[in-house]
Regions:
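Cyclophilin-like peptidyl-prolyl cis-trans isomerases
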Residues: 1-177
Length: 177
């Protein structure tokens, strides 16, 4: 899989800098549509978003609430606790061309059971083959500057619950074709 297979690009505007990600809508169409809809505020959700509202962009103001150096950085929870989501779950989309065989892949977090995707996502910072066919891969970080920002976040000091000591905020997400 290469970034030339991208159907859209998302830019996560974070407190550490911009992270540009290619989205693989041809391989994970439901997941990409969910992520884009939540990012743009065009998809309905039944919980409070990270800004405290019930409509509009879901991720704006959320944080990377779980960071494990050498493994991944996780965000997308409006509560910042690891337990929040949009109020619904949706199906997994495993594609044979998408494997956790390299770092910087964007995937959905879940609760360890099938079809429990919601809004939480993570970006890997190493090879994680044990996640194959357990988490839907739907994108990949596209450039070296973005990878450096991911690495900076991954190396951030954390507490015992893997939460960064200094919050790393997703200010907004923009999506382009």
């Amino acid at each position: 899989m290469t970034n030339s297979n991208a159907t859209a690009h998302a830019t996560l505007h974070t407190s550490e800098g911009d992270i540009r990600i290619a989205l693989f809508g041809n391989h994970a169409p439901v997941t990409v549509a969910n992520f884009v809809g939540l990012a743009q505020g065009t998809k309905d959700y039944t919980t409070t978003n990270a800004s405290g509202g019930s409509e509009g962009p879901f991720y704006d103001g959320s944080i990377f609430h779980r960071v494990i150096d050498g493994f991944m950085i996780q965000g997308g929870d409006p509560t910042g606790t690891g337990t929040g989501g949009p109020g619904y779950d949706f199906v997994d989309e495993f594609h044979p061309e998408l494997k956790f065989d390299r770092p910087y892949l964007l995937a959905m977090a879940n609760i360890g059971r099938p079809a429990t995707n919601g809004s939480q996502f993570f970006v890997t910072v190493g090879k994680t083959p044990h996640l194959n066919n357990r988490h839907t891969i739907f994108g990949e970080v596209v450039d070296e500057d973005s990878k450096r920002i991911i690495d900076t976040i991954a190396h951030a000091p954390t507490d015992r619950a893997d939460r960064p000591v200094k919050e790393v905020t997703i200010n907004s997400i923009t999506v382009e074709p």
